[in-house]
């Protein structure tokens, strides 16, 4: 079975799950997952994990993200995107000066309520399923970090604002659109969304599913953030059997264990000072 990860350019109109179908077919395995859902209406980079690399989903999900988004003022949909039903209208369209002033309030550590149409679990049920059934529910605000927001353009005549947003995991761009508009006494939805970066991985280096090849599969050794630890031959079997060997590691740090001959043996994650757990054993 193949093991590795892929940088996929997800197209609009497909769910992240649907995007995996051609990958499963190409590599002839159902052992394929993704790290970080990208909404159906959105496009951009999606990290797909193949084989044992599915166990690294948590690492990839934790990486910071970059988006290019387009907000349209004056209308709000129930989904806060272009696929939703219009539920609110506003005559007031903010000026670019007012927008620039308010954008500053959305940089840094902020609290936001995820959209009602989202994958958040509410008592074990996805929020979007409750919303589709007209159920009343509340979603608690969550703390996220927005590192930078750049205004790329603003067309007052079409009420369209284009932004580049760099943020932490769990940040909802649709919530930023909603909350920014409310702070300006207007309303808005996200008319277009493209994820351009996940951690060090950029959209320009991704591939469309129709262009998949064996060379598209990336190994851990390409990740500079994963330091390598070489294991003496006398301890290789210990690692292969999941036994503890002495390794210097910090909490939340990932390391690759390799044999002196260059064979990748395992991936470990620090859970304390010089304490770790096995994430993958090859």
From Swiss-Prot:
One of its GO terms (biological process) is tRNA pseudouridine synthesis. The active site is at residue 39. Keywords: Isomerase, tRNA processing. The keyword tRNA processing applies. The keyword Isomerase applies. One of its GO terms (molecular function) is tRNA pseudouridine(55) synthase activity. Its EC number is 5.4.99.25. Gene3D superfamilies: Pseudouridine synthase (3.30.2350.10). It catalyses: uridine(55) in tRNA = pseudouridine(55) in tRNA. HAMAP family: TruB_bact. Belongs to the pseudouridine synthase TruB family. Type 1 subfamily. PANTHER family: PSEUDOURIDYLATE SYNTHASE TRUB1, TRNA-PSEUDOURIDINE SYNTHASE. Responsible for synthesis of pseudouridine from uracil-55 in the psi GC loop of transfer RNAs. This is tRNA pseudouridine synthase B. The lineage of its organism: Bacteria, Pseudomonadati, Spirochaetota, Spirochaetia, Spirochaetales.
């Amino acid at each position: 079975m193949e093991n590795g990860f892929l940088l996929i350019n997800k197209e609009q109109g497909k769910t992240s799950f649907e995007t995996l179908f051609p990958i499963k077919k190409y590599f002839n395995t159902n052992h394929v997952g993704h790290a970080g859902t990208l909404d159906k209406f959105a496009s951009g980079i999606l990290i797909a994990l193949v084989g044992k690399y599915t166990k690294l989903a948590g690492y990839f999900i934790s990486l910071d993200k970059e988006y290019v988004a387009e907000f349209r003022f004056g209308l709000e949909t129930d989904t806060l995107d272009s696929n939703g039903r219009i539920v609110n209208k506003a005559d007031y369209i903010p000026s670019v000066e007012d927008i620039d002033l308010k954008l500053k309030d959305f940089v840094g550590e902020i609290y936001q309520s995820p959209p009602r149409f989202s994958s958040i679990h509410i008592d074990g049920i996805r929020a979007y399923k409750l919303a589709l059934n007209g159920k009343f529910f509340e979603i608690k605000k969550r703390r996220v970090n927005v590192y930078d927001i750049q205004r790329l353009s603003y067309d007052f005549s079409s009420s369209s604002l284009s932004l580049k947003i760099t943020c932490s995991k769990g940040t909802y761009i649709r919530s930023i659109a909603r909350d920014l508009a409310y702070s300006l006494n207007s309303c808005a939805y996200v008319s277009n969304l493209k994820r351009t970066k996940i951690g060090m991985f950029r959209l320009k280096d991704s591939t469309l599913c129709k262009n998949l090849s064996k060379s598209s599969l990336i190994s851990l050794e390409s990740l500079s953030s994963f330091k390598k630890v070489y294991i003496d031959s006398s301890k290789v079997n210990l690692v292969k059997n999941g036994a503890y060997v002495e390794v210097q590691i910090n909490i939340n740090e990932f390391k690759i264990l390799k044999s002196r001959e260059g064979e990748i043996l395992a991936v470990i994650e620090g859970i304390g000072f010089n304490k770790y757990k096995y994430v993958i054993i090859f």
